[in-house]
Amino acid sequence: MIQMALATEKALKLIESYNTLTLIVDKSDTKDDIKKSVERLFNVKVVKVNVVITPQGYKKAYVKLAPEYKASDIAHKLGIF
C-alpha cells in the first residue's frame, strides 16, 4: 500500500498548483488499489491516479484529488507542508 509521501520541490509544487499528492507505493499496487486506499485513509475523493516506476526501482503515484478537497490539508496532516 502507501509507503510514504514525497516532500520534494516538485511534489510541493504539484500540491499547490494541481491539488495532487505524490506518494511512494508498493510495486504490486494497481491504480485502483491506490485510489481506494487514499480515499479510505484520508476520506477524500480521488479524480485520477498516474503511476511511474522510477529508475531507482520504486513506484511513485501522482494522486489528483477532487476540487472540493485540498491536497495541502492532507499534506499538512502528513507533516509535509
Curated annotation (Swiss-Prot):
Family annotation (Gene3D superfamilies): 3.30.70.330
PROSITE patterns: RIBOSOMAL_L23 (PS00050)
InterPro entries in UniProt: Nucleotide-bd_a/b_plait_sf, Ribosomal_uL23, Ribosomal_uL23-like, Ribosomal_uL23/eL15/eS24_sf, Ribosomal_uL23_CS
Pfam family, one: Ribosomal_L23
BP GO annotations: translation
Recorded GO MF terms: rRNA binding; structural constituent of ribosome
Record keywords, A-Z: Ribonucleoprotein, Ribosomal protein, RNA-binding, rRNA-binding
GO cellular component: cytosolic large ribosomal subunit
Disulfide bonds: none
Domain of life: Archaea
Stated role: Binds to 23S rRNA. One of the proteins that surrounds the polypeptide exit tunnel on the outside of the ribosome.
Cross-referenced PANTHER family: 60S RIBOSOMAL PROTEIN L23A (PTHR11620)
Subunit relationships: Part of the 50S ribosomal subunit. Contacts protein L29.
Family, similarity comment: Belongs to the universal ribosomal protein uL23 family.
Protein name: Large ribosomal subunit protein uL23
Organism of origin: Saccharolobus solfataricus (strain ATCC 35092 / DSM 1617 / JCM 11322 / P2)
